Design a protein with these regions (language model features):
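Catalytic cores of carbohydrate-active enzymes across secretory and cytosolic contexts
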Residues: 11-12, 18-498
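Extreme N-terminal basic, low-complexity initiation segments
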Residues: 1-7
Length: 498
C-alpha cells in the first residue's frame, strides 16, 4: 500500500491526535510534506472572534484543517455584480482560504436552482419535488467550470484534493482537462439514491460520467455505495475490478463508505460542563418536573418535522396522562428561504404547530416549543444532556450528526433515549436507539411512549451499546480513513481534450 504523501493527521486533539501523529510519523519519515486542498460549496472563514460556521460539514472539516498546511477553497456566500475570476486569499487562524464570489444569476441557477431544486430532492427520494431546468443545469456546470479554472492555478502537483458534496460533483471533470492528474477525492454527505430514482433526473447520466473523474468517492453507508456502484454499472457499463473499484471509459474509480463521525470526547466535555446561559436557565426553570423531548434540525422537508409533530400529537392523544408532563422542544433554523418548496414547508410546519398547541395546550403548558433561530454548539450540548428523549426522524438523511451528538452528550449514569429513523445513515451504527419508520406516526408515537417509560437499566444498556462505536469511528477516524484510501489510489492517467 502506498504511504500517505505528506499528510499530517494530528488535527483532532487527544486521544485521536496521538494515533494520528503516530500514523504520520511511521508512514512519512522525512518525506517532504504536500498539502491538502479542501473544496466545499461554502467556506467557513472564522470571524473576528475566531468562530466559523457551525454546520456539520464545517465543524468536521475545520477539525481536520486547523494544523494542516493547505487551502480551503469555495464560495463566500456573497454575490457581486462582477466577481473576480481569481480567488481572494485570506489567512486567518493559521489557515489559508481561497474565496470566490458569485453573480446573482450564478446563485440562482447553481445553488438555488439545480443543486437544491433538482439534485437535493432527487437524492432524498423526493422526485415529486424535483424541478429540473436546463438553464439551471447549465448554470451548475458553469459555476463548477469557473471554480475549476480558479482552483487549478492554486493546486501543486503533489497536493491531495478533497471535494465535498453534491454542489461540486462535476468539479473533477472540469479540473482534468486543465492538466490536473492529482489524486482527487469526493465525499458525498447526503444519500445516494437507488439507480431507478436517480434516473428520473434529466442529466443523471452526465452526472455519473463526471463522477468517474474522481479517484475515490466516499459515501455515508454501504447502501449508498451499492446504489452508486449499481448506477455506474447500469448507465455507464462500468466493469467491476478488485473490491470497490470500477472501470469505465478508460477511467478507474473506487467507491467506498466512510460514515462521518463527531469529536466525541470534546462534545462530552462540552455537555458535562455547560456554560451559564440565559436560554438554558429559562428552559430548566420552565420544565419544572416535566420531561424534555428534543428535536434539532435545519428546516427541510427531508427532516420530517411536520410528520414528527403529528406523531407527537398522536402520542398525547393516546396517553392522556402525559399531557402537561412532557415538553417537546423543536429547534429548526430556517434555510434556503429563496427556494419555493421551503417557503411552503415553513407554512405547513407553522400551521401544524398552531393546531397542536391550540387544541392540546393548557394554561401553563404548551405542548411544543418551536424555535427557528440557531443555537451555539455549547447550548445544544447542554440541551441534549437535559433531554430524556431525542426525536431524530428524518424521511431520508445521509448520516445525521444530531443523533450522534445526542448520544455523546448524555450523562453515563442517567442517559436519555434516542428515537431514530431507519432512513438515517446513523441507524446503521446506533442500533441501541429505538429505530422507527418516520412515515408511521403510530409507530413513532409508541416509541415516544416506550422511551418515556423505559427503565433506568435499559437506558444505560442501550446508551453503552452506542457510545463505544461512536468513539471508535469518530471524526478523526473518518478523515484519516478517507485520506489514507485516497492516497492508496493510482494517479489519473486518462487523456483529455484541451
Amino acid at each position: 500500500m502506498k504511504t500517505l504523501p505528506g499528510v499530517v493527521l494530528s488535527w483532532f486533539g487527544p486521544p485521536a491526535s496521538a494515533y494520528a501523529l503516530s500514523f504520520a510519523t511511521s508512514r512519512l519519515g522525512s518525506a517532504s510534506l504536500s498539502r491538502l486542498v479542501i473544496v466545499s460549496n461554502r467556506v467557513p472563514v472564522p470571524d473576528a472572534a475566531g468562530k466559523g460556521t457551525a454546520g456539520g460539514l464545517a465543524v468536521a472539516l475545520r477539525e481536520a484543517f486547523q494544523t494542516y498546511q493547505g487551502i480551503w477553497f469555495g464560495w463566500t456566500g456573497r454575490v457581486a455584480a462582477q466577481p473576480s475570476p481569481e480567488p481572494r486569499i485570506v489567512d486567518k487562524g493559521g489557515m489559508q482560504y481561497a474565496l470566490m464570489d458569485l453573480t446573482s444569476l450564478d446563485r440562482q441557477e447553481y445553488y438555488n436552482g439545480f443543486a437544491n431544486r433538482a439534485l437535493w430532492p432527487t437524492m432524498h427520494y423526493r422526485v415529486g419535488l424535483s424541478d429540473f431546468s436546463r438553464a439551471d443545469y447549465a448554470g451548475y456546470l458553469r459555476v463548477n467550470r469557473t471554480f475549476a479554472r480558479a482552483l487549478a492555478k492554486l493546486v501543486l502537483p503533489s497536493d491531495l484534493v478533497w471535494v465535498h458534496d453534491y454542489h461540486l460533483i462535476p468539479l473533477a471533470a472540469e479540473l482534468r482537462p486543465l492538466g490536473l492528474t492529482n489524486l482527487i477525492g469526493y465525499f458525498h454527505h447526503i444519500p445516494w439514491p437507488a439507480p431507478e430514482v436517480l434516473g428520473t433526473l434529466p442529466g443523471s447520466t452526465d452526472i455519473l460520467r463526471s463522477i468517474m473523474d474522481f479517484n475515490l468517492v466516499g459515501v455515508q453507508t454501504e447502501r449508498d455505495a451499492d446504489n452508486l456502484r449499481r448506477a455506474l454499472i447500469q448507465e455507464l457499463n462500468a466493469a467491476p475490478q478488485k473490491e470497490d473499484v470500477l472501470d469505465a471509459d478508460g477511467k478507474s474509480i473506487c467507491v467506498k463508505s466512510f460514515p462521518i463521525g463527531i469529536d466525541v470526547i470534546d462534545f462530552q466535555k462540552v455537555a458535562a460542563r455547560p456554560r451559564p446561559n440565559r436560554i438554558l436557565g429559562q428552559t430548566i426553570a420552565g420544565l419544572g418536573s416535566r420531561k424534555l423531548i428534543i428535536g434539532v434540525d435545519r428546516l427541510d422537508y427531508s427532516k420530517g418535522i411536520r410528520q414528527r409533530m403529528e406523531a407527537y400529537e398522536h402520542f398525547l392523544a393516546s396517553n392522556l396522562d402525559q399531557r402537561g408532563q412532557v415538553t417537546y422542544l423543536q429547534i429548526a433554523p430556517t434555510s434556503r428561504s429563496e427556494v419555493p418548496e421551503y417557503e411552503t414547508l415553513s407554512r405547513d410546519v407553522n400551521e401544524t404547530l398552531g393546531r397542536i398547541n391550540g387544541s392540546l395546550g393548557e394554561p401553563g403548558w404548551v405542548p411544543i416549543q418551536y424555535v427557528t433561530s440557531s443555537y451555539p454548539r455549547s447550548l445544544l450540548a447542554a440541551l441534549y444532556r437535559l433531554a430524556r428523549v431525542a426525536l431524530v426522524t428524518p424521511m431520508r438523511d445521509g448520516m445525521n450528526l444530531v443523533a450522534k451528538e445526542y448520544v455523546a452528550a448524555q450523562d453515563p449514569l442517567d442517559p436519555g433515549v434516542l428515537i431514530l429513523s431507519k432512513f438515517a445513515g446513523a441507524a446503521q451504527q446506533l442500533t441501541g436507539a429505538l429505530i422507527v419508520n418516520p412515515n408511521d406516526k403510530l409507530e413513532v408515537a409508541e416509541a415516544i411512549r416506550d422511551a418515556l417509560r423505559m427503565s433506568h437499566k435499559e437506558r444505560v444498556i442501550r446508551w453503552q451499546s452506542m457510545i463505544g462505536p461512536l468513539r471508535d469511528r469518530d471524526v478523526s477516524w473518518w478523515a484519516t480513513a478517507f485520506l489514507k484510501e485516497l492516497a492508496a489510489q493510482q494517479r489519473t492517467t486518462a487523456t483529455y481534450p484541451n
